């Protein structure tokens, strides 16, 4: 079974983490976006791509019960919802295991792209549907620094988790 972390690593490789700022788990409480996104990719030019990772059909379907998605799927509110929730994104994608593609094509609005995680010998992301350009919003230097700060916080949290795991393993020996 494909895990979220497998897709995260493949996304980071695909978007080239050496050339772009890539930060996982950006929540709305951080004041950067109007909703939580699983991965945020910022180019050197200051344009953002958001990615939502789904690893099961139930997970994918549940995403459409979120407030921002309900507003987006309402034909009377679609444009307003796009501007409210997605105005900081140039592109937005769903990243899924390859076997979810038929369901994803049926559920995900056409302006969002779809990446499929291919878990053959070399694990990689395949662009199954190209995202349409949503907005041409250029992030300010202040926004970019804030995202980098969030990325640093993620690194710290991961290092602390590794440290705790190593200490537990040492105690078992």
Language-model region placement:
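Residues at the C-termini of beta-strands that transition into short coil/loop
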Residues: 26, 54, 118
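Active-site beta-strand-loop-beta-strand hairpin of nuclease catalytic cores
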Residues: 37-56
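Short, flexible, glycine/charge-rich loop motifs used to bind or transfer phosphoryl groups or to couple energy/partner
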Residues: 11, 28-30, 39-41, 81-85, ...
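Hydrophobic/aromatic beta-strand patches that form the interior of the parallel beta-sheet core
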Residues: 49-51, 93, 113-116
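Catalytic cores of nucleic-acid endonucleases
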Residues: 55-109
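A general structural motif
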Residues: 19, 46-47, 89
